Regions:
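Catalytic cores of carbohydrate-active enzymes across secretory and cytosolic contexts
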Residues: 1-315
């Protein structure tokens, strides 16, 4: 595709995140995880890092809170139209869910740095003609529905995301999983690499943000088997993701060469929660230019030239 031409020429790092916050009109974020993902993308563009990001289109958003006349809080869909901001790709791929072929298409949005670089973001969409009605809704809501809905989304993000990058022609040398939602990408990579875990580990990086056990996705193998159905795949998930239930974080950690938490303290808590894994600490940051008001930008421009390239000058 013409709008991806420059990105396809480079060896890319693929950054997978269930939510990404890029602009308020594109409601594919719920909170901090999406905000941080957006800032990673912005910083990568500033530094001209060859990154491509993958997420779900979530065209009905997370939810929008409204107070009714009685003062009660109510939630409503936060719908947006991808065609206003993005380009629809011609390529389609398929994933198996309950032994059905579910077709995926992709929208592309390119974030352009105020300096020089850019990062393409791939938004996966199951609202494709020919899919069953329930399958067309998989990418409607961010974190919507129950465990079944969530696991379907994670199949689309992880397995479908890898397949879409291949279909679009990206040459990926590293896969970065931002939380366990995308961990099923490692299953797809295992199958592409003769089930060799060492080859997959060399390809994968995992970042965990969640300091409590309840925050990590876990799925009963009855549900996993019902949706994935391939017995060999389910056995792979048991081998690397836990025997009693499928823990997406354990699966990601067992198949990653590098694991990090998001502060020193958080890495210590995560190491205690998941003993036996070396969890490094990379402190969360923000893309300072984005979150600095125009008034302060002018002030910094006057007294701290080039602060947008070296934000530590403002500290």
């Amino acid at each position: 595709m013409e709008n991806l031409h420059g990105a396809l020429e480079r060896q890319n790092i693929a950054y997978f995140s269930m939510e990404i916050g890029l602009r308020s009109e594109i409601s594919t974020y719920a909170g901090g995880l999406g905000g941080l993902a957006g800032d990673v993308i912005r910083s990568a563009a500033d530094l001209n890092i060859p990154l491509v990001a993958v997420t779900l289109v979530s065209n009905k958003g997370y939810f929008r809170q409204i107070l009714d006349p009685e003062g009660n809080q109510t939630e409503h869909a936060d719908e947006w139209d991808p065609s206003r901001f993005m380009t629809l790709c011609e390529e389609e791929v398929k994933v198996k869910i309950q032994n059905r072929d579910v077709k995926l298409r992709a929208w592309t949005y390119t974030y352009k740095s105020h300096i020089e670089g850019c990062v393409p973001i791939i938004f996966l969409d199951t609202n494709v003609e020919g899919n069953e009605s329930e399958d067309r809704k998989i990418t409607d809501f961010l974190y919507g529905g129950d465990q079944r809905y969530r696991l379907k989304q994670e199949i689309v993000l992880g397995i479908g995301g890898v397949r879409m990058l291949n279909a679009l022609g990206f040459k990926v040398r590293k896969y970065h999983m931002n939380e366990g939602h995308s961990s099923l990408l490692a299953l797809e990579l295992l199958k592409q690499n003769s089930l060799d875990p060492n080859k997959v580990k060399e390809l994968c990086i995992f970042t965990t943000h969640t300091p409590v056990e309840a925050g990590h996705d876990k799925f009963d193998y009855g549900l996993v088997g019902d949706l994935i159905q391939d017995k060999n795949d389910v056995e792979i998930l048991r081998k690397y993701g836990g025997q009693n239930y499928f823990d997406t974080s354990i699966f990601a950690m067992n198949l990653s060469n590098y694991i990090n938490g998001v502060t020193k303290r958080h890495s210590q808590i995560s190491s205690a929660l998941y003993s036996g894994y070396k969890i490094h600490a990379i402190t969360n940051g923000v893309h300072s230019y984005t979150w600095t008001s125009p008034y302060f930008r002018k002030l910094y421009d006057r007294y701290l030239p080039d602060w947008e390239n070296e934000p530590e000058l403002a500290s």
